Amino acid sequence: MELKTPLYDAHVKAGGKIVEFGGYLLPVQYETGVIKEHMAVRTQAGLFDVSHMGEVLCEGKDALANLNQILTNDFTNMVDGQARYSPMCNEHGGTVDDLIVYKKSDEYYFIVVNAANKDKDYQWMLRHQFGEVTFKDVSSGYAQLALQGPKAMQILKKLTAEENIPKKYYHAVFDTEVAGIPCIISKTGYTGEDGVELYLASEKAEEMWNTLLEAGKEEGLIPCGLGARDTLRMEAAMPLYGHEMNDDITPLETGLKFAVKMAKNDFIGKSALEEKGTPSIKRIGLKVTGRGIIREHQDVYVGDKKIGHTTSGTHCPYLGYPIAMALVDADSVEIGDTVEADVRGRRVAAEVVALPFYKREK
């Protein structure tokens, strides 16, 4: 059965084109269209409904030990209010999911997982828990809104005191409020822009949504759908589960070495990653130089030799040209090399470029 977020009716009323994603009915775009929504986030501000994401509480004396065992990153030195990104590996080193962990206190962590994986992730956590710890799926009680763009903070400051807003990226303020609505304010996002993600009670979602849109009118804030969220994350070269990673692809192959702490005593998948050694494949960026757009699942060649396949691809509104990401043989190409993708039997040329494609000016 397809699920609806608390904002479903608001999306329909606003002219959102509804599609299924991760088991949920969500707007892929509004009447403004993907390009305008994308550009609003790069130049002004956009508001996304991300309530399909899953939330899990991890509580207890052994919460930290459990996180360090189940996840690849190290959570030992986190301070209260800090957030940390991490892959979660299976015993073979493949990626179960990628997620964000927020620390509220030594015995209380708030975990945010991908929508399509939330049941799988929760069961994985329960299966591997040990000691004094409780994992609790609280997804149904939460809505998540993402306010993103260079003017996001300007808008937010109209609705809450500055001390309620995290100063640093990947930090959060718990038990705070925006426009009198209780929430968690997190300085995170999936767009490559400045901004926040707000976690709040589901029943308050529509009130918060309308309040933010009204407050941001002067700054050009508009609602944005999944289409713009995807093109924005591609420009920022952020991996998406099911594309750049899955149960068979390791986080090291995806280029997430920064979030895999091999110096830790142990974690699920560590021995498999050690056995594999240096990754045999790598994620690369492609700037399309030929005619056409390279989408996902296209074979990539150097001459007649197939070296891998694309995982995501689109035309980027802000950059003004098509891009793609691909997983290829690790020693096959370097930055500056030319490759070709097979697009429905036709070869389309592309240059290997450094990731990310887009990085905002600080």
Task: Mark where each language-model region is.
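Well-ordered mid-protein domain cores that form the structural environment of catalytic cofactors
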Residues: 74-128
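Acidic active-site catalytic centers that drive phospho-/nucleotidyl reactions
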Residues: 49, 98, 197
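Membrane-targeting and insertion segments and their boundary/processing signals
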Residues: 37-41, 92-95, 99, 179-186
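Acidic, proline/glycine-enriched N-terminal capping motif
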Residues: 1-86, 94, 227
